[in-house]
Amino acid sequence: MKKREKIMEYVFLLAAVISIVAVALICIFLFANGIPAMKKIGFAEFLTGTKWKPGNNKFGIFPMILGSIYVTGGALIIGVPVGVLTSVFMARFCPEGLYKLLKPVVNLLAGIPSIVYGFFGLVVLVPFIREHFKNSNGQSILCASILLGIMILPTIIGASEPTIRAVEQSYYEGALALGATHERSVFTVVVPAANSGILAAVILGVGRALGETMAVMMVVGNQPRVPNSILQGVRTLTTNIVMEMGYATDLHREALIATGVVLFAFILIINLCFSAIKRSGKE
């Protein structure tokens, strides 16, 4: 028995080491290729330049950074209220029979491939926006934000619903004993008690939205420009890499890898925030 436990211990250790090595290799690849490219282009020019014209050796990714921020921000404006309120409903208001139906639906949303979401956006959302907004061809920040807002719902609901459900029942019962209604007890006592978990769920949603590529590429327009309206098309960091990596060479290829470094930095900051919030929640 001890021998079997020892073998399993080594298996788990090997799995952990493989995971760490994989992340380390990715980091080495990104930074070894990306940082030299930033030096060649110029850090300020690369991060704040507004022109992306590889044929003229202009590699400014500021429009793509703005595009990623606008699309992600729009997705949060749409997805966070819906996701959090759905989590509250499922944890504290939902009848058991409806919960058994609603939970698999949320899980199914999480399992739908990105390309299917993108096809839905291209066939349904883009024509809808084109028809109702005369100044847009449909492929825009607004369309991508709506689509991403739907896509991050399973992430937000899946992470925040258990947190709300895990709040001690004594909090809720104490509020009822003081004369509060069921709704008031939930929204003034239970939800604030779960705020660290809900915020962590939102941060996970940000990471999901920021890293999404295929669905966004199909509906966002992909113009590398600084937008003046949510009805205009933009290009995000991820779509820029996917669209051009297949034919890029030399400095152009290195600039795309450097774009990956910037994206990696964004995701790293988000994960650090998530870890900090989890620690503060435990304390």
PLM regions and their residue ranges:
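Transmembrane-helix boundary motif in ABC transporter permease subunits
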Residues: 74-106, 274-280
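Periplasmic/extracellular loop-to-transmembrane helix junction in inner-membrane transport proteins
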Residues: 3-6, 10, 32-75, 95-96, ...
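Generic hydrophobic transmembrane alpha-helix motif, especially the helices
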Residues: 107-148
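Amphipathic cytosolic juxtamembrane alpha-helices at the membrane-cytosol interface
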Residues: 5, 95-100, 168-169, 173-200
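Interhelical loop and adjacent transmembrane-helix boundary motif
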Residues: 216-263
